[in-house]
Amino acid sequence: MQPQLLLLLLLPLNFPVILTRELLCGGSPEPCANGGTCLRLSRGQGICQCAPGFLGETCQFPDPCRDTQLCKNGGSCQALLPTPPSSRSPTSPLTPHFSCTCPSGFTGDRCQTHLEELCPPSFCSNGGHCYVQASGRPQCSCEPGWTGEQCQLRDFCSANPCANGGVCLATYPQIQCRCPPGFEGHTCERDINECFLEPGPCPQGTSCHNTLGSYQCLCPVGQEGPQCKLRKGACPPGSCLNGGTCQLVPEGHSTFHLCLCPPGFTGLDCEMNPDDCVRHQCQNGATCLDGLDTYTCLCPKTWKGWDCSEDIDECEARGPPRCRNGGTCQNTAGSFHCVCVSGWGGAGCEENLDDCAAATCAPGSTCIDRVGSFSCLCPPGRTGLLCHLEDMCLSQPCHVNAQCSTNPLTGSTLCICQPGYSGSTCHQDLDECQMAQQGPSPCEHGGSCINTPGSFNCLCLPGYTGSRCEADHNECLSQPCHPGSTCLDLLATFHCLCPPGLEGRLCEVEVNECTSNPCLNQAACHDLLNGFQCLCLPGFTGARCEKDMDECSSTPCANGGRCRDQPGAFYCECLPGFEGPHCEKEVDECLSDPCPVGASCLDLPGAFFCLCRPGFTGQLCEVPLCTPNMCQPGQQCQGQEHRAPCLCPDGSPGCVPAEDNCPCHHGHCQRSLCVCDEGWTGPECETELGGCISTPCAHGGTCHPQPSGYNCTCPAGYMGLTCSEEVTACHSGPCLNGGSCSIRPEGYSCTCLPSHTGRHCQTAVDHCVSASCLNGGTCVNKPGTFFCLCATGFQGLHCEEKTNPSCADSPCRNKATCQDTPRGARCLCSPGYTGSSCQTLIDLCARKPCPHTARCLQSGPSFQCLCLQGWTGALCDFPLSCQKAAMSQGIEISGLCQNGGLCIDTGSSYFCRCPPGFQGKLCQDNVNPCEPNPCHHGSTCVPQPSGYVCQCAPGYEGQNCSKVLDACQSQPCHNHGTCTSRPGGFHCACPPGFVGLRCEGDVDECLDRPCHPSGTAACHSLANAFYCQCLPGHTGQRCEVEMDLCQSQPCSNGGSCEITTGPPPGFTCHCPKGFEGPTCSHKALSCGIHHCHNGGLCLPSPKPGSPPLCACLSGFGGPDCLTPPAPPGCGPPSPCLHNGTCTETPGLGNPGFQCTCPPDSPGPRCQRPGASGCEGRGGDGTCDAGCSGPGGDWDGGDCSLGVPDPWKGCPPHSQCWLLFRDGRCHPQCDSEECLFDGYDCEIPLTCIPAYDQYCRDHFHNGHCEKGCNNAECGWDGGDCRPEGEDSEGRPSLALLVVLRPPALDQQLLALARVLSLTLRVGLWVRKDSEGRNMVFPYPGTRAKEELSGARDSSSWERQAPPTQPLGKETESLGAGFVVVMGVDLSRCGPEHPASRCPWDSGLLLRFLAAMAAVGALEPLLPGPLLAAHPQAGTRPSANQLPWPILCSPVVGVLLLALGALLVLQLIRRRRREHGALWLPPGFIRRPQTQQAPHRRRPPLGEDNIGLKALKPEAEVDEDGVAMCSGPEEGEAEETASASRCQLWPLNSGCGELPQAAMLTPPQECESEVLDVDTCGPDGVTPLMSAVFCGGVQSTTGASPQRLGLGNLEPWEPLLDRGACPQAHTVGTGETPLHLAARFSRPTAARRLLEAGANPNQPDRAGRTPLHTAVAADAREVCQLLLASRQTTVDARTEDGTTPLMLAARLAVEDLVEELIAARADVGARDKRGKTALHWAAAVNNARAARSLLQAGADKDAQDSREQTPLFLAAREGAVEVAQLLLELGAARGLRDQAGLAPGDVARQRSHWDLLTLLEGAGPTTQEARAHARTTPGGGAAPRCRTLSAGARPRGGGACLQARTWSVDLGARGGKVYARCRSRSGSCGGPTTRGRRFSAGSRGRRGARASQDDWPRDWVALEACGSACSAPIPPPSLTPSPERGSPQVAWGLPVHQEIPLNSVVRNLN
């Protein structure tokens, strides 16, 4: 073989070679770029062998795969050459791209993403498998039984519970089936009988026949169709009425017709208009009006909407306000009602209530009616709220500076001393300096104290000032330093910090910077502050005049003059012809008369021109035209202009004139002279004058005449036709690519188009740097943009969408035929191509088609054979002649052509002439009728003997498959899709919600995440719909609506409901004392609410009065089973027994352990299998730990519930008894014989936390809860078993267990559930034939008599608990019970391999015994399990109970020991002497033992001994504050009510109580130490009651001395004995300091603060004592609290209210100023974003608003609704505040979130006076105030200051407003009833107020009140007294921030309030 051919065969195996027909080697330049080598082939063709790193036809492309880091994580890179579409411009840039083939475990366009990052191991829960979708999103494939995006939800639908095609919806706590039409029921199991529906489905005159899921109408003769609407025959004329259309319907061989009725008509002939009002949806009493196919609802005037369901808001209607006098209009369904402010009544608040009608002012006083109250105007000498007291201040007993008042309780003189005085009359001066000797000096910083009357003075050391020398004297206040400097205050001096440029002590010396002569070039220096200024001479510039100005830069020289710069000046070098300083003057060369006489001079720029007289020429006309010998003889030279012709004089004979043949270029010759045309001159008219005559060239340009005009030669710096354009930097066009050039002082700048950048716009912006083409797409940069060349199968701007190619997308390449298939487009490739898109060229030469060593050369989809010598033909398979061919093959010439063909020589070759029917080069082939292919559209041609047959592709038919089939005839589109026939198939346009080729796929609507994320548990896709499974507390189609869970009043027993925000949202019930639970439905200290998590079981506490306990499962621990299980291995606790040492060992999963045991404990866990001395101890009823093991038969069964060997049958060598329930799987023990290794090899079963509490609460309640009917949730206590299976024959299990009788039922449920969870079988307490639980007291020592069989089960009675506690714990107070439990083993056994659990009673008992043997059972049960026995009957007989445990002597010993303990406990109780202590009535004395931190245990067996039960001690909350306990569980409600809520008459004062009641009540043991913090009703301690009743003067003579208190206040001895000042009430959480503030007890408040009371302790609502003092207007208490450094002035309640906001809201003006003085934050905001100024504006508190504004409050502050104080003032009609705000420039245009401005809301509320004020023409302040008092709705009237009992109005004003108090009132039996609170009077409490009902009036919900409607602790109002021990009314701050002024009420908020005088009148 030739070397060249061998090289060509080897090249494709090693180098990237591209063949092209047009590439020729040896050309210039070389065709192969980038170092490629051109290899020549035959016929002049060539190929390029590219260097490494390049590819392409001519090696013109860089190989993108040369970067080895392009594909990450071991991915392989493959370069892809660009193939531009035919429509692309040939100039478009094309670059090769690449594709990465990723290894397993990676993905991404560069293999950069690890699949584990998208699918972390914990992404899918509950065994779900995570995979990555084509879109890149992770998706979970859930195990059966689980669903959700991460398999986190239990799939209740996995078992397909819905029948008959119902769709299962997973809802909590059970499934819901969405039934198809025709079925109903919980699981769609019932067929709907449509024939029973009203109206029936069939028309009248037909019979209805029900079918499964549907119905059939039996039509009369002549009618057909589903509705019998088809009638036989053609359409008769006029048969269809009311516009109906008759349509023929062929049915078989007959013709029917039916009427197609228009909307609104029905019937066979469309004769009926059905009544659409039959099923109307009109609501609220609307009238339905029938129409055509519709109806109209005629709504009442209070409703609107299409169905009259929208309530018309009468409160927002136009017109006068519904509620007058400041009343608040509240819209209701179909109406409205007015909530009137205090003092007004009536339906529209139009009635002013006369409070003086029932006033009780003392005789002689005048009653003044107020709004909502009254005041008494006292005569001289009388005082008090009712003028009932003698004015003790008339004699002026107090010091002149003291404030005198009369005590409203005692009537005595009360002197309030000024600071510095003391004593009862404030005449005693306090020596503050002497008092300082015992404590810190009042003068700070070493000042000397000098006492003065009522005060003191401080002599301060130098440098300090202030009344107490507390302030450093600020010497900088006098501004000693020079202006501009900073003064720094020091101790007794100051220091000036000088700015640059000043110096000196006071910075008064200015530094002269000109002294150093900084200015250059003789410039003048001007001194400045911290600088200087140089005044430069002309020609210089710069900060120091150091720069010489380039005067030539402005081109001052004109006319081409050259500028020469000089220091400070310049000069111009002018061109010839110009002069002047700037060459601005043109020189007139004619002034020197250069032309001779007779010639005229013409001045030109820089030159001159002589116009010669005739006969002369030359520059100076010095050349005569007539020269000697110029003319012929006889001729005479005639000198003319520019010429001198020779002329014959007249009359000269013999003179021959000259011929007219002179040469004129631009003229004509006349008499030998040239007459020039216009614009030309010269002897021969050769010079063009043009435009140069007018000197058009500017700036010294030279003019050159041209044939068509002129041409200017411009000097440097100018250009243009006339040199008029100045040359600039932009004239050279420096900005490329369309950039625009702009002149700048420094040169020029280019503004580039978006497609380019750079200084000259020379760089194209590569948009591919920031763009990202996904899925292997290649980015192609274009000017100003980019586009992505997407890989096959992707589309979009960034190739982000995956395509499903169809033939419409032209996916086939290389002239292939496209065919649509269900799976997408299919390409039928042309010969030579392959691949899904026919994109791959087949290597035809690889098949070696060229024989006889011919060279194969492929070009595109074809190839060519290069024949060797002697061969020819397309395949080089023919010799050059017939003879040579025959000789080469060794045959005859006649045999060369087969099948009778004839060989014929032609030229240098030959061919075979074939007979008919054969073809081929040698006639070797039969003629193929399929070539060329006669079948069209990609069909397959099959040869036949008689021709061919075309097998048509889908969608075509005909002999040659040329006819297109209508693929839509078969209606292939499902779900109402629209079919469109296409060549080769069809296309379905799917309706919304469906996808797929045939619209058969339902769109997963959940992919768009339609459900609200915060309220959705899971999204379920349905048929063309979706279903959002909402979390608790959410509802709505998308779970977007938060439910008002409190609307249904879920809280029982008087609990109050509060919405919680979540997530998820819910509600919280605040339970009254004695109740608890989510809905307050359980009594306290019970298992109804106690949450034991992680499957734990709640057990009643063995200690009465203690909270319940949790028995935890699955290794969890802690009080609530929240402590996670201990890690496997060595724990803790250690698995090794008997002091063995544990060592962790590695394992496949969790670590294991190995025990190093002492010699006497050789077991794997250091167990002692057998011990000496165990003989005779087995079976004695006592479990001996040393004998517990297989060696000792588990102590004869004593340690294993009487079963000698639970592991009987288990191979001994496996030692499975040592491995049982150790937390690790041991396969050798995972069998029935070895008790399944204690389920250690199973996945731990845990009830779903969301279901656990529900399943616990509904365990064995008689109702099947399917969600709880599984092993992990305890099989629902057997509630789901078939009925009737609790028969005598069902297996049972009899247990002997110790339980506690007080909570027996709860313990039985706990016992059954814990055994069900542990054993994985269903267990429940069986019932006998009478429905009673089969629980029997164990008779103990009477076993032999009672269990002998003499008595049957019917004679057994439920007895009281035994007299002695039975069991192992003496503290448990338990008794032995025989509990017979039913067992459901139906889900266990070999037939249920998935449920590994005991399948017979014997195996169940062995498993239970094994757990007891290893100690794993007792911690789970509510009491010790002593024995167990399988049973089948209802009552175990004596011989069936294998438990002699309690009959043994050991039990007797235990009982004797128990009795001894009881006696010792009674004997060892100590007695203590104590003195008398005042306690209020109703408080129960309790002994205070030494073990105060521990709860006392009641005497053991107190129920049997007969001791009086002790009340439980007060509990202590987390703050260490004593709380009061509720009644004992099981205590009667009447008893509890009588003891806890004692009612006292209101008509008796504190002093009227019996003396015995005022003294210490007799106790059970007088010698015991009294508990001074004992709790009374509502947790009120004696200290609280003392504060409440402080300062009482008995009207019956019971003085403090008679009470045994001496002159002390009642709280003094309590505090001296250690009473807790931090205790708080149960209901409101108020401390004694709260009560002191609430009832204005400054003395008590001072004493409590000295005793350490916390002034910042919040109550239940978050109010501190300062809040309470502000609300009660207790100024003295406020001053005490503000004086305390511990008080937080800006403390906040739960809604963010500060004391300052409260004071502004309640119009307590004086306290507003005092709080501001105490540095309260005037800018603080509550949770609604409102400031104190907002609240002052809302209630028209102008004085407070002015004080707040003066303190710096923001007048334009906006709250969370973007409402300003001016907005609230406009809304509430607060004219005075609005006037004040507008005077201070408040913004009128600020709008709220609804877009309303203050003027808009004033217009809405009809506040016309305010609207006028806001629009700029408002009245004066006085007019506005007067108008506000008289105009309804114009704003609230000025408020009187409110005073609490015990306070006196300051300033002597008579404007008093009685504090009102809430009292729950009702009517029963014609009387007024009230929940008694307290009133003002001798006890100092406030007067009650509340809501009054008359007999028979409506209650809260509109129902008629009856006696059963009222709580039993309500009494008649006239029976209420004022006992100080009555329950203190709880405070309730009920502001109305949106409408009107707030109200302060103490007690439960009520809808209507009565004034003080009404209550007082009833009391009298």
UniProtKB/Swiss-Prot annotation:
One example GO MF annotation: signaling receptor activity
SMART domains the record matches: ANK, EGF, EGF_CA, NL, NOD, NODP
Signal sequence interval, chain numbering: 1-20
Residue ranges of ANK repeats: 1628-1657, 1661-1691, 1695-1724, 1728-1757, 1761-1790
Impact noted for substituting V1463L: NICD processing severely reduced
PTM: Synthesized in the endoplasmic reticulum as an inactive form which is proteolytically cleaved by a furin-like convertase in the trans-Golgi network before it reaches the plasma membrane to yield an active, ligand-accessible form. Cleavage results in a C-terminal fragment N(TM) and a N-terminal fragment N(EC). Following ligand binding, it is cleaved by TNF-alpha converting enzyme (TACE) to yield a membrane-associated intermediate fragment called notch extracellular truncation (NEXT).
Membrane topology of this protein: Single-pass type I membrane protein
Residues that span the membrane, as ranges: 1444-1464
Extracellular side, ranges: 21-1443
Any one Pfam family match given in the protein's UniProt record, by short name: NOD
Superkingdom: Eukaryota
Disulfide bond entries: C25-C38, C32-C48, C50-C59, C65-C77, C71-C100, C102-C111, C119-C130, C124-C140, C142-C151, C157-C168, C162-C177, C179-C188, C195-C208, C202-C217, C219-C228, C235-C246, C240-C259, C261-C270, C277-C288, C282-C297, C299-C308, C315-C329, C323-C338, C340-C349, C356-C367, C361-C376, C378-C387, C393-C404, C398-C415, C417-C426, C433-C449, C443-C458, C460-C469, C476-C487, C481-C496, C498-C507, C514-C525, C519-C534, C536-C545, C552-C563, C557-C572, C574-C583, C590-C601, C595-C610, C612-C621, C626-C637, C631-C646, C648-C655, C662-C669, C664-C674, C676-C685, C692-C703, C697-C712, C714-C723, C730-C741, C735-C750, C752-C761, C768-C779, C773-C788, C790-C799, C807-C818, C812-C827, C829-C838, C845-C856, C850-C865, C867-C876, C882-C903, C897-C912, C914-C923, C930-C941, C935-C950, C952-C961, C968-C979, C973-C988, C990-C999, C1006-C1019, C1011-C1028, C1030-C1039, C1046-C1057, C1051-C1069, C1071-C1080, C1087-C1098, C1092-C1110, C1112-C1121, C1130-C1142, C1136-C1155, C1157-C1166, C1174-C1187, C1183-C1199, C1210-C1234, C1216-C1229, C1225-C1241, C1247-C1273, C1255-C1268, C1264-C1280
GO biological process, one term: venous blood vessel morphogenesis
Keyword Magnesium: no
SUPFAM superfamilies: Ankyrin repeat (SSF48403), EGF/Laminin (SSF57196), Growth factor receptor domain (SSF57184), Notch domain (SSF90193)
InterPro entries: Ankyrin_rpt, Ankyrin_rpt-contain_sf, EGF-like_Ca-bd_dom, EGF-like_CS, EGF-like_dom, EGF-type_Asp/Asn_hydroxyl_site, EGF_Ca-bd_CS, Growth_fac_rcpt_cys_sf
Segments in the Cytoplasmic topological domain: 1465-1964
Glycosylation sites noted in the Swiss-Prot or TrEMBL record: N711, N960, N1139
Classification via PROSITE patterns: ANK_REP_REGION, ANK_REPEAT, ASX_HYDROXYL, EGF_1, EGF_2, EGF_3, EGF_CA, LNR
The keyword Zinc-finger is annotated on this UniProt entry: no
Biological role: Functions as a receptor for membrane-bound ligands Jagged1, Jagged2 and Delta1 to regulate cell-fate determination. Upon ligand activation through the released notch intracellular domain (NICD) it forms a transcriptional activator complex with RBPJ/RBPSUH and activates genes of the enhancer of split locus. Affects the implementation of differentiation, proliferation and apoptotic programs. May regulate branching morphogenesis in the developing vascular system.
Record protein name field: Neurogenic locus notch homolog protein 4
